[in-house]
Regions:
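Extreme N-terminal starter segment of soluble prokaryotic enzymes
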Residues: 1-2
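Hydrophobic adenine-recognition pocket in adenosine-nucleotide-binding enzymes
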Residues: 86-89, 123
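Conserved acetyl-CoA-binding loop-helix of GNAT-fold acetyltransferases
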Residues: 88, 94-108, 132, 136
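Acetyl-CoA-dependent GNAT
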Residues: 6-10, 21-78, 84
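Short acidic/polar active-site loop segments enriched in Thr and Asp
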Residues: 116-117, 140
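Conserved beta-strand-loop-alpha-helix junction that forms the acyl-donor binding cleft
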Residues: 119-131
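Conserved catalytic-core motifs of GNAT/GCN5-like acyltransferases
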Residues: 122-123, 135-151
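Hydrophobic pocket-lining residues that define ligand/cofactor binding sites across diverse proteins
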Residues: 110-114
Length: 151
């Protein structure tokens, strides 16, 4: 049975590193290194709001997933919560409900703590498993389009 909990940097770092490395290796559209990820992780650990929002999923005491969000304040003063893709190992991906459980927990945290009634979820068009989960959770393609440009 999968249980969710808060990320503890003292206890969970090594297990998260293993999951991160597997995730980066198998999700070709994400480019990062453990060093870059750990640097961001260390910043988030110092911010109570972000520290409490880092959710892990455990199966029989072993960490099998990790998820978080980023709060963005736009130039009009609107807060937007952006849920990132949940980190899992390839063999666990979408088979055990890890992603769904973590996303549901994050949505609940965002609603209760930040008092927001809308979240945005990052989903690659090429990732049909995540897109199916996002639709199962009732999310629809946003009218807010983001474009990317190399500079």
């Amino acid at each position: 049975m999968i249980e969710t909990d808060r990320y503890d940097p003292r206890l969970d770092r090594d297990a998260l590193k293993e999951i991160f490395e597997d995730f980066i290796e198998n999700k070709s559209y994400f480019i990062s290194t453990w060093k870059e990820f750990e640097k961001e992780l260390n910043k988030r650990v110092l911010d109570l709001q972000y520290r409490n929002s880092m959710i892990i999923a455990k199966e029989e005491g072993v960490i099998v997933g990790w998820g978080t969000y980023t709060l963005i304040k736009d130039y009009l003063g609107n807060n937007r919560a952006l849920i990132h893709q949940v980190l899992t190992k390839r063999e666990d991906s979408y088979r055990k409900g890890i992603e769904e459980q973590i996303i549901r927990e994050l949505k609940l945290y965002i609603k209760r703590t930040l008092n927001l009634d809308k979240v945005f979820i990052i989903c690659q068009d090429s990732d049909s498993a995540l897109r199916n989960l996002v639709m199962k959770l009732g999310a629809k393609k946003s009218k807010n389009y983001w474009y990317e440009n190399d500079i």
